């Protein structure tokens, strides 16, 4: 699907607009029209064949993304913040749905994912976080995803990952990209919006989704619902664990310190006990590269989904996403790596 087709998909559907609830009817109509125009331009960033965008200037000397001014990106980010705040921290999602893991800044691979799974609104989606960093097109990626979120707020969901945090994306690329192509001010506005994103999703009450994993502090799902926003990601505690923890085999105890230096690793028995307590069929999380794009754990009661193939140009991994159909049958679609990396042995 090319950019023109993406635009048509977006323009055929109503767009969520927080401004539409304010002012006289004429102002609402004008505001909605501006929304349509902006969303369509967002989708027109690049075609699936484009490997790298070429920054342009907006007449003031400020570098801008192809066809999009800083004011328009800022508008998108602020509207998305309002939408996130209007929805719960634990979003409840109906099947059918596609569940996608880390995508980072690999924009053309995102378009490949939509080619395989169906472009919204032909398919419903929940993404498990990590939209920015470790790629040269984080802005294209996060802006297109936010545009879809605004266009289809009840069928397109974005969870927060550990890279949607200022202390992380300041180091791993997103801050530098915002500064180079727009401004530090825009990066700060992205940070404010990331601080309002939901941290977990529940598909038909049976599949619990998050970016990282479980927490020893999580004893009631209402704890997630009660998290106040906006919030940064603390160094420890429930939010930190939902975004940072990992499953691990061959553990001597149920919980151990994570080698990442933050949060925990948890055992198979933790997963099985948690699912039994909350009557869950599956925990679906992301956060770790896996060769096939997905990998089961704890007798298929947890699955890791990773959707960025050839991650960072350092791995030969495939990407994948999970499809949950109307009958709650689960299957996986792989995003094959486009190149084989050379390995040298000494």
Swiss-Prot record:
Q: Which reaction does it catalyse?
A: O-phospho-L-seryl-[protein] + H2O = L-seryl-[protein] + phosphate; O-phospho-L-threonyl-[protein] + H2O = L-threonyl-[protein] + phosphate
Q: In the record, what terms sit under GO molecular function?
A: metal ion binding; protein serine/threonine phosphatase activity
Give the cofactor note.
Binds 2 manganese ions per subunit.
What EC identifiers does the entry list? 3.1.3.16
Which positions are annotated as binding Mn(2+) 2?
130, 162, 211, 287
Q: Which Gene3D superfamilies match?
A: 3.60.21.10
Name the top EC class: hydrolase
Superkingdom of the source? Eukaryota
Provide one Gene Ontology cellular component: cytoplasm
Q: Where does Mn(2+) 1 bind?
A: 102, 104, 130
Could you tell me the keywords of this UniProt record? Hydrolase, Manganese, Metal-binding, Protein phosphatase
Which residue pairs form cystines in this protein? none
Catalytic center at which residues? 163
State the residue spans of region: Disordered. 46-65
InterPro entries given in the database record:
Calcineurin-like_PHP_ApaH, Metallo-depent_PP-like, PP1_catalytic_subunit, Ser/Thr-sp_prot-phosphatase, STPPase_N
* Cofactor(s) it depends on: Mn(2+)
Which SUPFAM superfamilies does the record associate with it? Metallo-dependent phosphatases
Q: What PANTHER family would the database entry show?
A: SERINE/THREONINE PROTEIN PHOSPHATASE (PTHR11668), SERINE_THREONINE-PROTEIN PHOSPHATASE (PTHR11668:SF300)
What family, per the record? Belongs to the PPP phosphatase family. PP-1 subfamily.
Additional facts recorded: Trypanosoma brucei contains two PP1 genes which are highly similar.
The protein's name: Serine/threonine-protein phosphatase PP1(4.8)
Please tell me the species this chain comes from: Trypanosoma brucei brucei
- Please spell out the taxonomic lineage of the organism that makes this protein: Eukaryota, Discoba, Euglenozoa, Kinetoplastea, Metakinetoplastina
